[in-house]
Amino acid sequence: KMDWTIEKAVELGVSHIVPLLSARSVVKLDGARAEKRVQHWQRLVVAAAMQCGRSRLPEIAPIQPVGTWLASLPAPQTHEQRWVLSPLAESSLMAQARALAAQAGAPPAEDHQNPPGDAVASKAGATTAWLLCGPESGLAETEVDQALSLGWQPALLGPRVLRTETAGLVGLTVLQAALGDLG
């Protein structure tokens, strides 16, 4: 599943992929197995980038626990927006991304006529959009709480329950459509 997700994320234009271990993760990789898996994913990144004509390769970070990764991040900058997918969120990722674009004075997403290669969120004044998606059973409440305490915004994808590989890619696509990189 992760192979497919990485391949499609590369095609969608992500710049960083951070494989995370959640309290609810089914697969637990560590040590040499984790290193081998990251090397495998790096080969997938190269192949996917070649396939879709990308000149910049996304970075694959080492596998790490969600809490460790969140704690290691610097505070959000003005040019960043961070979302955590949560079924308990009160508003959708699309609504939040569109509101961000509107605040920055960007035209509605359906009006965008972007040349190829525009960065996600470029019309909204943000140069970096982060999306945190949990495993099949979702992030643990403590993991979501940690993200929220660090400035992440909770977001829904809609009324459906999606598989993790689908949720991440739908989230990326929603951000691209709302912020002007797709369409």
Which stretches of residues belong to each language-model region?
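Intrinsically disordered, low-complexity terminal tails and inter-domain linkers enriched
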Residues: 75-77, 92-127
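A C-terminal functional module that forms or caps the active site or interfaces directly
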Residues: 128-146
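Residue-level preference for the first positions of well-ordered beta-strands
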Residues: 81-82, 126-130
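Structured adenosyl-cofactor binding patch, chiefly the S-adenosyl-L-methionine
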Residues: 140-183
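RNA substrate-binding interface of SAM-dependent RNA methyltransferases
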Residues: 1-84
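Short amphipathic alpha-helical segments
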Residues: 31, 96-98, 143-145
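Generic structural signal for helix capping and beta-alpha/helix-loop junctions
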Residues: 26-27, 92, 164
